[in-house]
């Protein structure tokens, strides 16, 4: 997150503060009460729909079973199921098939497309497949053969596979440079081939599979796949039915979230804060969209909305007011009202305490009182965030620019991804997470640190024009005496390296289950989408079409 807000906090001049507060207005919500219209009546899933989905699901399962293990068609089928967003129905079947491929494949294919597809599928599953399988497609100097440029499908698979690289895998770095440059050239010259393939290449160059949000990616791929003349009608129809059924569930959840948000009266009581309940829910569906994570979505949605309010309050309040708020959050006294504090401080604290009380109720109701320890892990992150936000406010108050190391230590906390990574586990079933998982994730493992790097730096790279607030760009420029362009280039490389660290953590032996690691990976995917070409959180018009595709328009 940081859910970066370009408002100047903690200024010394009270008169200037008043002027800033009057002008510190974000774009209002573009959705308003739109999602309140979705209720149990118009989002009801009929018995006939459920029966049809179940019927087609079994037909797809039979298709998977009929295709010979280890065959190219089996890999293509698994890839289609994953990209259509219905792989969560067939996790065991896919695991068994890919395990067979991993144990029995000789990697002796002559086609780059097959080699790259196998490599990507296995790496996505967490298998440590050597990148040397691509050397057969290079010359003595390690350059990829120019003949590969005649195979668009092969180039596309090579490009997608290259995004599964870890640090030190230079051949995959060269594969990415080679494939992306040639695909772009072919696209520019209209030499890709069919319209359907051209659209796939264009989408891949914008958003490779590894960085794609599963739900949004599935919505887009379904539209592309139905234009494919070789499409499998069974798979396509099942994907459409499943997407629409899950969309109805999300619509009900978003209606509930909107109703909860309205009760907070944020627009009235905290008008300086961004009204982004819909965008926050989109963020969380990016972390987990599957029906089994409904409780987790409710909890994480409340947490991210509270993080946004707290962030905006620390951007808005004076330093003295922030001292009061920070101290109160450290005490975390549910009976404290801060009645002698300004209204916005009182409301921020009250909303925060109330939200986490509701989260505790959710945990008790769904998992039992013995699981309440989960919420304490989440609250501890909120406390750490308050201290870090206050540290940032003091930098601005004192007109100081910290070193890159000082900045990143604080910004890792204020970006919100440590908090979201931990809180993403709070609403997950006891069969999927344990106390040991919480102990692991709060100790800042590499994958969480990498997600923080991606979040913090991508946020800064689109928001560095706001020079009132120290950013990694400004800190880097000052410390290393380089131009803004040079600073940005080096920070962009750090983002690329962070993705490689994320990939490494997902390969066996893994530090946690793939289900847990995927939550953190998905957080990285969300930030890549939202901040790739601008701040699509603060400016809701940037994310409007994505929201419509996922929550409004059925297929």
From Swiss-Prot:
Top-level taxon of the source organism: Eukaryota
Binding site for Mg(2+) 3: 459, 467
EC id: 4.2.3.100, 4.2.3.-, 3.1.7.11, 4.2.3.20
Stretch list, region Homodimerization: 316-322, 392-429
Keyword Kinase carried by entry: no
Tissue specificity annotation: Expressed in peltate glandular trichomes. Present at low levels in flowers, leaves and stems.
Protein name in UniProt: Bicyclo-germacrene synthase
Organism: Origanum vulgare (Wild marjoram)
């Amino acid at each position: 997150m940081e859910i970066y807000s370009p408002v100047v906090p903690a200024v010394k001049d009270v008169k200037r503060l008043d002027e800033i507060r009057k002008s510190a207005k974000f774009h209002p919500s573009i959705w308003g009460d739109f999602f309140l219209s979705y209720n149990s009546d118009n989002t009801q899933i009929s018995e006939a729909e459920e029966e049809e989905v179940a019927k087609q699901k079994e037909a797809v399962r039979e298709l998977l079973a009929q295709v010979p293990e280890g065959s190219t068609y089996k890999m293509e089928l698994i890839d289609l199921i994953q990209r259509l967003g219905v792989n969560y129905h067939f996790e065991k079947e896919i695991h068994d098939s890919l395990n067979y491929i991993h144990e029995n494949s000789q990697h002796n294919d002559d086609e780059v497309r097959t080699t790259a597809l196998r490599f990507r599928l296995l790496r996505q599953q967490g298998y440590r497949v050597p990148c040397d399988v691509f050397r057969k497609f290079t010359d003595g100097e390690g350059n990829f053969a120019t003949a590969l440029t005649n195979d668009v499908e092969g180039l596309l698979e090579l490009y997608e596979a290259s995004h599964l690289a870890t640090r030190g895998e230079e051949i995959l770095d060269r594969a990415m440079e080679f494939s992306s440059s040639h695909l772009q050239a072919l696209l520019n010259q209209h030499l890709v081939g069919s319209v359907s393939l051209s659209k796939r290449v264009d989408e891949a160059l914008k958003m490779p599979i590894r960085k794609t949000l599963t739900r949004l990616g599935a919505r887009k791929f379904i539209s592309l796949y139905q234009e494919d003349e070789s499409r499998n009608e069974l798979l396509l129809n099942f994907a459409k039915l499943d997407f629409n059924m899950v969309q109805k569930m999300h619509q009900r959840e978003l209606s509930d979230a909107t109703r909860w948000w309205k009760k907070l009266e944020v627009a009235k009581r905290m008008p300086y804060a961004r009204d982004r309940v819909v965008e926050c829910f989109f963020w969380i569906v990016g972390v987990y969209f599957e029906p089994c994570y409904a409780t987790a979505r409710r909890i994480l949605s409340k947490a991210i909305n509270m993080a946004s309010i707290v962030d905006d309050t620390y951007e808005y309040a004076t330093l003295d007011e922030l001292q009061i708020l920070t101290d109160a959050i450290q005490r975390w006294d549910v009976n404290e009202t801060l009645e002698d504090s300004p209204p916005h401080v009182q409301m921020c604290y009250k909303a925060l305490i109330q939200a986490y009380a509701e989260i505790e109720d959710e945990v008790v109701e769904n998992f039992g009182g013995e699981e309440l320890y989960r919420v304490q892990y989440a609250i501890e992150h909120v406390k750490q965030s308050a201290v870090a936000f206050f540290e940032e406010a003091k930098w601005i108050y004192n007109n100081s620019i910290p070193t890159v190391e000082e900045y990143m230590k604080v910004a890792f906390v204020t970006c919100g991804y440590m908090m979201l990574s931990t809180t993403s586990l709070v609403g997950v079933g006891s069969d999927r997470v344990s106390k040991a998982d919480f102990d692991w994730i709060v100790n800042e493992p590499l994958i969480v640190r990498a997600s923080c790097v991606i979040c913090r730096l991508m946020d800064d790279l689109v928001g560095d024009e706001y020079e009132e607030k120290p950013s990694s760009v400004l800190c880097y420029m000052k410390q290393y005496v380089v131009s803004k362009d040079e600073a940005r280039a080096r920070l962009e490389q750090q983002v690329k390296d962070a993705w490689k660290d994320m990939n490494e953590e997902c390969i066996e032996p893994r530090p946690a289950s793939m289900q847990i690691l995927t939550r953190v990976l998905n957080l990285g995917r969300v930030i890549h989408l939202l901040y790739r070409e601008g701040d699509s959180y603060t400016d809701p018009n940037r994310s409007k079409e994505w929201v419509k595709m996922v929550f409004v328009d059925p297929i």
